[in-house]
């Protein structure tokens, strides 16, 4: 039975942006406005999380109905409930200083994550806090006048760039090598073929990135809903998969399996980077101080970032290859076999002071990427 699945899904693309203004003083003022909005977003997020936590934990003598009617001190006007109290407090504190649409989006994100944390169990972790690297969301209508136009770069060459205006600030996108096809997606957004959703700005040092969220149609793929691709996530071989049910039950037989990646390919380079980190930690003892911790640990942070980037790239590649195998064999479902058992075993080894597996192999990141790429083509992903 062939099933043709076609739905829409929201994808996120990371694109570098910068203020497009020739006047030096005006450009500086625009950047100050962006960073001030970022600081306000961080304050609003932490304030909202604190308010929600206080309402849930500091008034045990009140009934649930009374908690919904509690108002905050200092809020003028009508009484505010638990749902809209954070927005009322934020509007009183920051109205006129930042875009209130951005403030509303921040509050919605914080409330959603707070409710998710409550379901998982607040006692299992500390209250979520927000720092300066958090994405600052803006409504899609705030990204005005999105268009492509010719411009002259610093070398006098004519190029075509993408320009838009965000809360009165002229900005331009920098696509770079564009191996992910971001320019094509933005062109379709500008033409009206794709719908732009609430997107965010993320500040990374001196760079600003646009986390562009776009509602795109899923790829039309003919899949057999009854056909299943069985996959094992392992350390020796990152992914082993098969469409044969008998082979899936006889994992150790080594027959009829398709292997994705090798232990040497993934772990060897990662262990090299970890060795660089260890050397930096040792050498930091002998470096000259007096210029701050950030300067002293600069090399260490560099290699930490390299390791994260390497792991993310590899997991993207492995998950892409697994979904391609499922599409090739027209499998409508991917089953991760014995995955829960393997994760429990890894946790036990970690508790026995043998942290190699969880330290060097990323079960959770790989699972999330497989599910994300599977949804793009209509493939269901399940665990056993």
Walk through the language-model features, giving the residues of each.
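Residue-level signal for secondary-structure boundary elements
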Residues: 42-49, 53-57, 115-123, 281, ...
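Generic detection of short hydrophobic beta-strand segments and adjacent strand-loop junctions
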Residues: 5-21, 169-187, 251, 256-260
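Long, compositionally biased intrinsically disordered regions
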Residues: 1-106, 110, 281, 288-301
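Acidic carboxylate diad motif detector
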Residues: 66-204, 360
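Residues in well-ordered beta-strands of folded domains
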Residues: 18, 200-202, 211-213
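Positively charged, helix-rich recognition surfaces that bind polyanionic ligands
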Residues: 3-5, 210-384
